[in-house]
Curated annotation (Swiss-Prot):
Its EC number is 2.3.1.-. Residues 994-1009 have a biased composition (Basic and acidic residues). Residues 548-731 form the N-acetyltransferase domain. This is RNA cytidine acetyltransferase 1. It comes from Arabidopsis thaliana (Mouse-ear cress).
């Protein structure tokens, strides 16, 4: 049955066409696809030009194939099964055949950037992300339609509980329940969009779109050819410059007055040919920045510039730039293949993007793409174009600037990567230095001429577009003006940290929405690269939490307090041992839990993932409160909070438990039909800001952080006692920075681990020691180009030591033996170098060896910071002297002098070790230990005398024993013999023995006695001769 379309729908579309504003339709129902034909028909009748083109975006499958033959077979089968009404089937089939429909997968949505369509159809709502939403809606021209197709819903509030595809990335092992806060806020925001209609698949308007009940038609202009004031000014500009070559033909390609003025400004700088001139172009998304840059580059080629370099985060970002370079060449009547050639990349990652254009009409000219970190290739450049500079880190952008003409464009609000830091920091610095005298400015940017251009008028649609305002508010894109200056700057010690309740923050209440816009403005103005997807991560991810640092709050004033600092924290860890072992075995890490998985991978440790920790995702300080200590105060308060110093962890206070989840829209909505459902923001919400003393903290073992490694950021975190454990060896292709992760153990972890209480790193100390050794070994290869100041900060070596007594017991860990480190020949060469007898080249190998030992703190020798830096550059990074001169700004003679001082100090210590080793090999007298007597000398003498007297008395008694004296008695015969005997002249006396000899003498014995007598006789003779 035919049904008349609601007149308000037709009026909304016609008003959009007249005002060049876009309209949005949300169609709910299984037959929502059939209403696209009607909406397209209404739009076609309203516009004067040909049928509007259609962009159809989907997740992975279309209900009806986009291929003609496949679609015919598919429709035939559906008709036979009775799944389609023949009348509607013919209408939709005719629609697909007649209308120019571009089908695009969500994952391939980047290829539609820069294109323009009349209608954008989005199906598969569960696959949508904020980035996809902004990217696809941005392609619709003024007067066009945005159509969102939803499956049949019992109520609109069921969108809030819909499981989105992106939620899979938000879930972790310990946090598995993702919320639907973003969908709830999206649904509530539809009621505030004056150009949005929510209806069912029969085009019945739902109560959520009650705001269009009073819609009226916009009066039609009497003169359809009448131009707006901006269009008249653009026409006047084109007529004035029409005869000027080459700027005239290029201005004719411009669509808005802002774009035309930008091209004129670029061309003035080109013709001026002044070195050190910078022209910055900043605007929101869809203002024609890239097109203006492309036309300006074509003009530079016509003006005779030979070497032009173009850079962006990726060659895909330069698609529009190169496209308008070619359009500019067409306007200047350059012929492709005859006067210029286009070279495309063969790198599959660049998707055949244009990377080079060779021009050879007048002389050889080149337009070449380079990556942002390849600034060393800019030696011969005449013009450098930097597109999407907001997505490139500030240090990299600064390294690209030099004594040549620079065109720079930046997106200050959009969806590819926004950042006010470029305009707030770099552009402000350029403005200040352009006013300063050349002699009074230091650095590479001194004396530069600076111009800034801002584009406000959109290319595709007119100003005041309601869809743009709604999208900017929903995704917090244009929040630069939402950040007021702080009323005062209190002392950091007077500030307090508050926990932000996310249910209240994303409830779409007026005050909560203003607070959210200010928070996102702080994040955009920081050094982080921002994306609309970050908003959905903040709202739906179960492990993420928000904290804000506020000054003293005056409760008597009914106004929101000034936000000085925002901290986004992600809870990680509590991973089972089984999951950790599986990850190590398969070499794959799930989404989330960055620090635990990376720690597990680096140290092959399955215990650390079981610990619970918090990763600081971002910390953003108000741009007008930088360098005032607010960031440090926020980190200190957060650390104390998780250590239980602000709110007790161990106490079992029920009122301090995590607040219960409030009633959601889905629970608050009345159980009514879709056509009667009233959607309103929730009431009775908990407080937006919760003091930390009123909320129990999670029990954590550590706090971590991950960021792109820069010197200022690393020093900030090291100041707060965070220690690194991982630095990626491969720098980012976009930023040129190495990813760095740091940890800080909390005091609660010391209660669960056996650690040295004197070591502030606790259980993390051995891992940090291992990291330093690995990092020092990689400095000569993967980190060879790292700035020496950053390398010194990462290593954090101990360079001041007390005097070490080599003769005594030196502390453990110091080098005590030269065996295996330096040979005697090495020591002799080293001695000769310290005595100025040989050149440094002769001991360069020794320098590398000793550098590794010194930075492992095995050589307790005190060095100055400059001396240690030179030793690091030569010994660890193995840099040449030219590189050291350039980095440290020292003369070569000064470097040699520093090396000699270092050598003398190291040789003194090593020579002491060698001397000690030599002394240990020499023989030594045995040391006798003299102990004091236990008795005095007099007592010792008395005891000795007593012992001697007793011995003498016992001996006398033995001698006077009668039995012993009997052996000396003289017998009768002996007495008689003595009386009668006389000594003969020979002197021999014969005594007859009374004892009988029973043994017979042996002949051999006789011989021996004879021989003995002979010997005695000979001996007697010799003695007589000696006496004579």
């Amino acid at each position: 049955m035919r049904k008349k379309v609601d007149e308000r729908i037709r009026t909304l579309i016609e008003n959009g066409v007249k005002l060049r504003h876009r309209s949005m339709f949300v169609i709910i129902g299984d037959k929502a696809r059939d209403q696209i034909v009607n909406l397209h028909h209404i739009l076609s009748k309203s516009v004067v030009k040909s049928n509007p083109s259609v962009l159809w975006c989907y997740k992975n499958r279309l209900d009806i194939s986009s291929h003609n033959k496949k679609r015919a077979k598919q429709l035939k089968k559906m008709k036979e099964r009775g799944q389609l009404d023949p009348e509607k089937l013919d209408a939709f089939s005719l629609f697909l055949d007649v209308v120019d429909v571009t089908h695009c997968l969500y994952k391939d949505s980047e290829r539609i950037l820069g294109n323009t369509f009349g209608i954008c159809i989005l199906q598969d709502f569960e696959a949508l992300t904020p980035n996809l939403l902004a990217r696809t809606i941005e392609t619709v021209e003024g007067g066009g339609l945005v159509v969102l197709l939803l499956q049949s819903l019992a109520s609109l509030t069921s969108l809030c509980t819909m499981v989105m595809d992106v939620h899979d990335r938000f879930r972790t092992e310990s946090h598995s329940e993702a919320s639907g806060r973003f969908n709830e806020r999206f649904l509530l925001s539809l009621a505030s969009c004056k150009a949005c209609v929510v209806m069912d698949d029969e085009l019945n308007l739902l109560p959520l779109s009650s705001h269009i009940k009073s819609i009226t038609k916009v009066p039609t202009k009497e003169d359809s050819e009448a131009l707006s004031e901006a269009e008249r000014d653009l026409k006047s500009l084109k007529d004035a410059l029409n005869d000027d070559f080459p700027v005239g033909p290029l201005i004719n390609k411009c669509c808005t007055l802002d774009q035309g003025k930008a091209v004129v400004t670029f061309f003035d700088a080109i013709l001026d040919k002044t070195l050190r001139s910078i022209v910055a172009l900043i605007a929101s998304r869809g203002r024609g920045k890239s097109a203006a840059l492309g036309l300006a580059v074509a003009g530079a080629v016509a003006a005779g510039y030979s070497n032009i370099y173009v850079t962006a985060p990726s060659p895909d970002n330069l698609k529009t730039v190169f496209e308008f370079v070619c359009k500019g060449f067409d306007a200047l009547e350059y012929k492709e293949h005859l006067e210029y050639d286009v070279v495309r990349s063969v790198n599959p990652e660049f998707n055949k993007a244009i990377v080079r254009i060779n021009i050879f009409k007048q002389h050889r000219q080149t337009i070449q793409y380079i990556q942002p970190h390849e600034h060393e290739k800019l030696s011969q450049v005449e013009l450098l174009v930097i597109d999407e500079a907001a997505a490139i880190p500030l240090p990299v952008v600064k390294s690209l600037l030099g004594p040549y003409l620079v065109f720079l464009s930046s997106t200050v609000s959009g969806y590819e990567g926004t950042g006010r830091s470029l305009s707030l920091k770099l552009l402000q610095q350029l403005e200040e230095q352009s006013r300063a005298p050349v002699t009074g400015v230091e650095g590479s940017l001194s004396g530069c001429l600076f111009k800034k251009i801002e584009l406000s008028e959109s290319i595709r649609y007119a100003s005041g577009d309601p869809i743009e305002s709604w999208l900017n508010g929903l995704l917090c894109l244009d929040v630069a003006n939402c950040l007021p200056n702080p009323a005062c700057h209190p002392l950091p010690s007077q500030c307090d940290l508050y926990y932000v309740n996310r249910d209240t923050l994303f409830s779409y209440h007026k005050d909560s929405e203003l607070f959210l816009q200010r928070m996102m403005a702080l994040c955009v103005s920081s050094h982080y690269k921002n994306s609309p997807n970050d908003l959905q991560l903040l709202s739906d991810a179960p492990a993420h939490h928000l904290f804000v640092l506020l000054g003293p709050v005056d409760e008597s004033k009914n106004q929101l307090p000034d936000i000085l600092c925002v901290i986004q924290v992600c809870l990680e860890g509590q991973i089972s041992r089984k999951s950790a072992e599986k990850s190590l075995r398969e070499g794959h890490s799930p989404h989330g839990d960055q620090i635990p998985w990376k720690f597990c991978e680096q140290f092959r440790d399955v215990v650390f993932p079981k610990l619970s920790g918090a990763r600081i995702v971002r910390i953003a300080v108000h741009p007008n409160a930088m360098k005032m200590g607010y960031g440090s105060a926020a980190v200190e308060l957060l650390t104390r909070y998780f250590e239980g110093q602000l709110a007790s962890i161990s106490e079992g206070d029920d009122e301090l438990e995590v607040e219960p989840s409030p009633v959601r829209v889905t629970e608050a909505a009345a159980k009514v039909s879709l056509l009667e459902e009233q959607i309103k923001p929730r009431a009775n919400l908990p407080p937006l800001l919760v003091p930390l003393r009123d909320r129990r903290p999670e029990r954590l073992h550590y706090i971590g952080v991950s960021f792109g490694l820069t010197l200022d950021l690393f020093r900030f975190w090291r100041k707060h006692k965070f220690a690194p454990f991982y630095i990626s060896q491969i720098p980012s292709a976009v930023t040129g920075e190495h990813t760095c992760m740091l940890l800080k153990p909390l005091t609660l972890s010391n209660d669960e681990f056996e650690v040295d209480e004197s070591d502030e790193l606790g259980f993390f100390a051995p891992f940090y020691k291992d990291f330093r050794i690995r990092f020092s070994k990689l400095l000569s290869d993967k980190f060879k180009k790292m700035d020496y100041k950053l390398a010194m900060s990462v290593l954090n070596p101990k360079i001041n030591f007390p005097e070490v007594d080599l003769t005594g017991n030196s502390p453990d860990g110091f080098l005590k033996k030269l065996d295996g480190v330096l040979s005697p020949y090495d020591m002799e060469r080293f001695r000769a170098y310290t005595a100025n007898l040989v050149d440094f080249n002769l001991v360069y190998d020794i320098c590398k060896t000793l550098a590794h030992h010194y930075f492992q703190e095995k050589l307790p020798v005190s060095l100055s910071y400059v001396q240690a830096s030179v030793l690091l550059c030569l010994g660890l990074q193995e840099s040449d002297f030219s590189s050291i001169e350039r980095q440290m700004q020292l003369e070569r003679g000064q470097i040699y002098s520093l090396l000699l001082k270092v050598g003398k100090k190291l040789y003194k210590y090593l020579n002491g070790i060698a001397t000690k080793e030599l002394e240990s090999t020499l023989p030594r007298l045995k040391d006798r230990v003299l102990e004091p007597h236990k008795v005095s000398v007099d007592e010792d003498l008395r005891e000795g005398a007593k012992e001697v007297e007793e011995q003498m008395r016992a001996r006398i008694e033995e001698l006077l024993d009668p039995e012993l004296l009997d052996q000396f008695a003289i017998g009768d015969k002996e007495a008689e013999a003595l009386q009668k005997s006389k000594i003969s002249s020979s002197g021999l006396i014969s005594i007859e023995s009374t004892k009988t000899d029973n043994k017979k003498e042996k002949p051999s014995g006789f011989d021996k006695s004879a021989k003995k007598r002979g010997n005695d006789k000979h001996s007697s003779t010799s003695n007589k001769k000696r006496r004579a």
